[in-house]
Amino acid sequence: LPLCCYLRLVSAEGDPIPEELYEMLSDHSIRSFDDLQRLLHRDSVDEDGAELDLNMTRAHSGVESESSSRGRRSLGSLAAAEPAVIAECKTRTEVFQISRNLIDRTNANFLVWPPCVEVQRCSGCCNNRNVQCRASQVQMRPVQVRKIEIVRKKPVFKKATVTLEDHLACKCETVVTPRPVTRSPGTSREHRAKTPQTRVTVRTVRIRRPPKGKHRKFKHTHDKK
């Protein structure tokens, strides 16, 4: 669990965590609980002793045999547990699924082998909630896969190339969140008033064709005098 997430969880359950603590964590490199203890200048011996006294009080309050056995098991588990170490921001091996869309989007009647490969990606947590582990150097790596098509109920093997993205270096970068733009109702109305509105009227005109008819033949008649 990242340290900042743990502090937010504790703050939600009990007293609020002061912002000064987040600022202290952002300016130092904390890799273990000892580093955190030295940074906060707090001795954990008294806390461990108080925890042991609390366990002993609970042991005597109930049934002595069952409570004492549970207390011994809890003390044994605490002694055997190793100290937690922060997951540093660095490259790690992850599994990348090769989908069929990366090879051919027009055809779905084929299989890809291998269906997944290993890539190097940045992961880990940073000491401040305002920074994230991101890649600072990236390399594109082409790999060759098999495209298995089914033609007339028989497999046909073809070769295809897929480009993978590997992360070579990582660092904790500041996360820039875009601020939402809030507009008042009056501003939107003024913007609409300033914007010229043009209306286009389209008229449909029907052209009437003359009726089809036979050509009449006119006979020339001489004028009688």
Swiss-Prot record:
InterPro entries: Cystine-knot_cytokine, PD_growth_factor_CS, PDGF/VEGF_dom, PDGF_N. Glycans are attached at residue 55. Expressed in a distinct subpopulation of smooth muscle cells in injured arteries. The keyword Signal applies. Keywords: Cleavage on pair of basic residues, Developmental protein, Disulfide bond, Glycoprotein, Growth factor, Mitogen, Proto-oncogene, Secreted, Signal. Residues 13-73, 183-225 form a propeptide. It holds the Pfam family PDGF_N. SUPFAM superfamilies: Cystine-knot cytokines. PROSITE patterns: PDGF_1 (PS00249), PDGF_2 (PS50278). Growth factor that plays an essential role in the regulation of embryonic development, cell proliferation, cell migration, survival and chemotaxis. Potent mitogen for cells of mesenchymal origin. Required for normal proliferation and recruitment of pericytes and vascular smooth muscle cells in the central nervous system, skin, lung, heart and placenta. Required for normal blood vessel development, and for normal development of kidney glomeruli. Plays an important role in wound healing. Signaling is modulated by the formation of heterodimers with PDGFA. This is Platelet-derived growth factor subunit B. It comes from Rattus norvegicus. The lineage of its organism: Eukaryota, Metazoa, Chordata, Craniata, Vertebrata.
